[in-house]
Amino acid sequence: MAVDIEYSYSSMAPSLRRERFTFKISPKLNKPLRPCIQLGSKDEAGRMVAPTVQEKKVKKRVSFADNQGLALTMVKVFSEFDDPLDIPFNITELLDNIVSLTTAESESFVLDFPQPSADYLDFRNRLQTNHVCLENCVLKEKAIAGTVKVQNLAFEKVVKIRMTFDTWKSFTDFPCQYVKDTYAGSDRDTFSFDISLPEKIQSYERMEFAVCYECNGQSYWDSNKGKNYRITRAELRSTQGMTEPYNGPDFGISFDQFGSPRCSFGLFPEWPSYLGYEKLGPYY
């Protein structure tokens, strides 16, 4: 079939062949063909792109009228000599409580000596030497109370506390009361005292006391090794007596929490073991 078409085309006249097929040749275009993808305008494209530089916020400024040469609406002058501030009641009450608390602390008293019975060895030696020794002492709201140990030298005995509230310009003797001993047949007796403190005590005066034991026409004193037992204000408390190092013998042992015989032997050589504990009396 291809042969027939070629033959018919070649058998035509030259002029006929040129005129018949000339219209099939497409003319040359001066402009390129329009693409099928439509792009937006430059403005629309610019709006689609995120801005890279952030706009700076403008800071607000406040200016007063006098800076602009104008008159102020109202002028208020504050002075410390004006009327007192209107402080709320709860704040005023709080300030009063703080002041009263500070005053109470300045008027509170403390013991300016350690408890004598805290060091048992020293307490026992003082009792045997002086026949009397303060055992313990505590401060209550407006009173001082404690106990005294004395050797039972005779049946008739008197124990009293000699106390001063004005640095020994004057003093008062307060009798002690006998306390029945729990252990019968003990060679030591116990006395107690409870002394009320005065309402007003001058800050420059010292409160001191000593213990007196009268028996068989003789007097025995416990004056805390000549320093007396002092009661001072909390803010003036002397820590010298409370921080003195222990001057007793150094046994060179470490305490055993289970109470081994080596510990008891170091403290009390007369105790070879706990077998002799039953033969001992109370520590006082």
From Swiss-Prot:
Gene Ontology MF term list = [phosphorylase] phosphatase activity; enzyme binding; glycogen binding; protein phosphatase 1 binding; protein phosphatase regulator activity
Keyword line: Carbohydrate metabolism, Glycogen metabolism, Phosphoprotein
Among InterPro entries, the record links this protein to:
CBM21_dom (IPR005036), CBM21_dom_sf (IPR038175), Pase-1_reg-su_3B/C/D_met (IPR017434), PP1_3B (IPR030682), PP1_regulatory_subunit_3 (IPR050782)
Q: In which tissues is it expressed?
A: Highly expressed in liver. Moderately expressed in kidney, heart, testis, spleen and lung. Weakly expressed in skeletal muscle (at protein level). Expressed predominantly in liver. Expressed moderately in heart. Expressed weakly in lung, kidney, spleen and skeletal muscle.
* GO BP terms in the entry: glycogen metabolic process; negative regulation of glycogen catabolic process; positive regulation of glycogen biosynthetic process; regulation of glycogen biosynthetic process; regulation of glycogen catabolic process
The record's Gene Ontology cellular component field reads:
glycogen granule; protein phosphatase type 1 complex
Q: Which PROSITE patterns match?
A: CBM21
Q: Which residues form the CBM21 domain?
A: 124-232
Q: Where is this motif: PP1-binding motif?
A: 61-64
Chain positions found as Phosphoserine = 260
Q: What's in the domain note?
A: The PP1-binding domain is located between residues 59 and 94. The glycogen-binding domain is located between residues 94 and 257. The PYGL-binding site lies in the C-terminal 16 amino acids.
Q: How does it assemble?
A: Interacts with glycogen, PPP1CC catalytic subunit of PP1 and PYGL. Associates with glycogen particles. Forms complexes with debranching enzyme, glycogen phosphorylase, glycogen synthase and phosphorylase kinase which is necessary for its regulation of PP1 activity.
Descriptive protein name: Protein phosphatase 1 regulatory subunit 3B
Instruction: Identify the species of origin.
Output: Rattus norvegicus
